[in-house]
Amino acid sequence: MENMGTRVIEPLIMGRVVGDVLDFFTPTTKMNVSYNKKQVSNGHELFPSSVSSKPRVEIHGGDLRSFFTLVMIDPDVPGPSDPFLKEHLHWIVTNIPGTTDATFGKEVVSYELPRPSIGIHRFVFVLFRQKQRRVIFPNIPSRDHFNTRKFAVEYDLGLPVAAVFFNAQRETAARKR
C-alpha cells in the first residue's frame, strides 16, 4: 500500500494540489473518476465539452458501513496567475457508502460543469472518509471562496483518503473540431 500511496501522491505534489488545496496526506482508498468511461488521471487534460455531465465516481475501499464525502473544486478561478476567487466549488456528495459510487450518496451541492475562462485550470476531486453517517449542510453563500481544508475541519473529516485532478482550458472553435 505504501508504494501505491507514493505513486498517487507525487503527481498531486507536482501539480501543486498538495499545497494549494490540500495538506500532505497518505492515500488509503482507491477512487476512480470517469466521464463517459474516460478515466480521470492526475494532470491529464480533458476538454470542457467532455466533462459537461456528472462524472461516475467509484470508491474501492471501506465497506457498506463506512461513509465518504466527495468534494470537487477549481483552485484556479478566475485564472491560475491570479486565483483571487479560489476555491470555486463544483460539487459535494456526502454519505457515500464504501465499495459503491457517488450516486448512492447524498448530493448536497449540485454538480456544476467546469467552465475555465482564463488559462489552464485544475479540477480537483477530494475524497474524505467520514467518522460516521451524518447530515452535512454546508452553509455556502457562494461557490467562490470555498475552502476545502476549512470544510474538512468544520465537519471533522480529517485528512483526505484520495484525490485526483485533471486540467482543462477554454475550448476555442478550432480546438472543438
Curated annotation (Swiss-Prot):
Keywords: Cytoplasm, Developmental protein, Differentiation, Flowering. GO terms for biological process: cell differentiation; flower development; meristem determinacy; negative regulation of flower development; protein targeting to vacuole; response to sucrose. It is found in: Cytoplasm. Pfam families: PBP (PF01161). Changing G105D: In tfl1-1; early-flowering and terminal inflorescence. GO terms for molecular function: transcription coregulator activity. PANTHER family: PHOSPHATIDYLETHANOLAMINE-BINDING PROTEIN, PROTEIN TERMINAL FLOWER 1. This is Protein TERMINAL FLOWER 1.
